[in-house]
Amino acid sequence: MKIAIVCYASVGGSGIVATELAKCLVDRGHEVHLISTDPPFRLGEFRTGLVFHRVETPAYPLFREPQYLLSLSNAIVQLSRELTFDLVHAHYAIPHATAAYLARQILSSTSGAHVPKIITTLHGTDITLLGSDRSYSETVAFSIDQSDGVTAVSESLKRDTYRALDVQRDIRVIPNFVDTNRYRRLPPAELRRQICPSGRYEKLIVHTSNFRPVKRAEAVVEIFKRIRATVRARLVLVGDGPDLAKVSRLVQDLKLGQDVVALGEQDQVVPLLSVADLFLLPSQQESFGLAALEAMACGVPVIASRVGGLPEVIDDGVDGYLKDPEDLQGMAEQALTVLGDAKLHERLAAAARRKVEEKFSADRVVPQYEAFYREVLM
């Protein structure tokens, strides 16, 4: 198949999943064209059959802000005419599903023109935050319904979509995934010694996110403070975003400056996860929880909020633990139990890895997308 994938280039679940899907599809013999404003964060090394197309959005004084929806639609039209895509896969409804619909209408206006099918994948905040906003809701619902096929990354998000929007289109749940050949525990001993010197620290706790309010990174620090009172632990924060400055101030206010290190955005998170003892994800909302899945693949027990799609990823007490988002004390106590019981830690880590291999590996999930593509193209 010849597939166009439209996604955001920034660090975030939708862009990461879209890019990893593109790479996997190419490895399985498809021709894939990534369309975005910049090379996506996880694009990586050159692959034959994977082509990146930059969307240029010129700024004109007449407009208050650049008209990305229009330039993206225009790019899809031009590339479709040149390359005759079988389908356009829009990741994140705003504005990608709308741009794909507009492009299809333009292509359909020419007699005899090749018109690709449109698939939209819903990732989370495109529905729960932006899509349900009255400023966007009617357009988002219309664009979803006009897609030839729609997927969501969890049953939770599927329910949220029907609850928030007047959507009639059937939604197929296809979960997020990781490449288990790449995401596995390969602990570099030197990195562990650098980040968590054995003479000073016993345990290493990690949190990765885009540091937006919904991720509640300040809660991570509050939980860590309770853990640090009992265990010589260090916290590593990976990522960047609008809340990072507030988190840094909280770290200083709590006098944890020596025990918390912020590494910013990192291309490679596997080495960091491979030396971690625990992963914290006390989000207010997670439609799936890709960060938790990546940690589990690397054999890191996860303590997370019982919200959204996380219960579909983590079986409480089997391969991780779930707590109410506001129960920071409960998360801290559970963390201390896991960190203090080597056999429990080993059991959780093994079960987490096994869960990813059995349900969320690329080998399990990418064929579901291929089957859905074929179904839509019939």
Map each language-model feature to its residues.
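Conserved donor-binding/catalytic core segment of Leloir-type glycosyltransferases
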Residues: T151, S198-F224
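Nucleotide-activated donor-binding/catalytic signature segment of Leloir-type glycosyltransferases, i.e.
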Residues: S248-G264
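Carbohydrate-associated surface elements
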Residues: S156, F177
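N-terminal strand-loop element at the rim of the active site
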Residues: I5-G12, A18, K23-Y68, I171
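A short helix/loop element that forms part of the nucleotide-sugar donor recognition site in Leloir-type
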Residues: R184-S198, Q368
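Short hydrophobic beta-strand element within catalytic cores of glycosyltransferases
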Residues: P301-A304, I314
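Aromatic "clamp/platform" in nucleotide-sugar-dependent glycosyltransferases that forms part
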Residues: E265, Q284
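Conserved acidic donor-binding segment of nucleotide-sugar-dependent glycosyltransferases
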Residues: D316-G317, Y321-L328, T337-K343
